[in-house]
Amino acid sequence: MKQRRKLKRRRKKKLRKWVKVFIIAVLSIALLVVAVIFGFKLQKVDTKLDLGQFTNKEVNDYIKKEGIENTLWFWLKNKAGHSDKLELFEDYTVKMNSPFKVTITAYEKKLKGYINVNKIYYYFDENGVILKQSTEKIKGIPKITGVECNNLTLYKKMEVKNKKVLQNLLDVTTSIQEYKYNVKRIDVNKDAEATMYVKDVAVQLGKNSNLDKKLRDFNDMYDNVIKYKGTLNMKFVSEDGSYTLKKADEKSK
């Protein structure tokens, strides 16, 4: 009997010991979770960007809008190759400076054009998503005219009356990035025909059929064409690469 009582006491003692260990483990895990959640609260983002299109404030506002709040989790996901998708960037890396601060080094998405509404510039990407809204104009990005917009909202795709017009515009703005000539403006009419303005030449590209060849042909004749002021008709592709340039000083027949 005495031996049985001793065994029971030992078992109870061991059980109490394991219960204590379990409680301590649970509390430790809980404290760790609390520390991760509240001890790594993202408060500031510094940036190192390749194009300088977005300000530090714009990036911070975007990060908040996306609900990225935990510094450690944001950094770990980036290191593990499972980064949060950020519309502003093609690719990026995250460096954790402190529990409250990170530095993002990124390759920005190239802004393809802008629409000016009431002196506000709405800049969009290759998908027609508005990525920047500003009162300042960025050099080297073409102005877009002729597109009737129903709604322009930051981080949303442009809502337009004619989807064909938008698609043709996006085809042109994306394709011209391959070439070095500086396009000042792109106009798209209601028939989805595009005209780009380079120097003093209005280049009529028409619809987006054979667009790549038209742009290659224009690139080949670029140095000769920009000497003049006028309209270059490239609405229909030419097999031999020859097109008609109507100079501004030529009188209409």
For the regions a protein language model found, what residue spans apply to each?
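Extracytoplasmic segments of membrane-associated envelope/inner-membrane machinery
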Residues: T105-Y181
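Solvent-exposed coil/turn segments that connect beta secondary-structure elements
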Residues: D50-G52, N97-P99, Y107-L111, E126-V129, ...
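Periplasmic polypeptide-binding modules associated with outer-membrane biogenesis and secretion
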Residues: L32, G39-Q53, L72-E126
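N-terminal positively charged amphipathic segments used for targeting/anchoring
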Residues: M1-I37, K190-K207, R216-K253
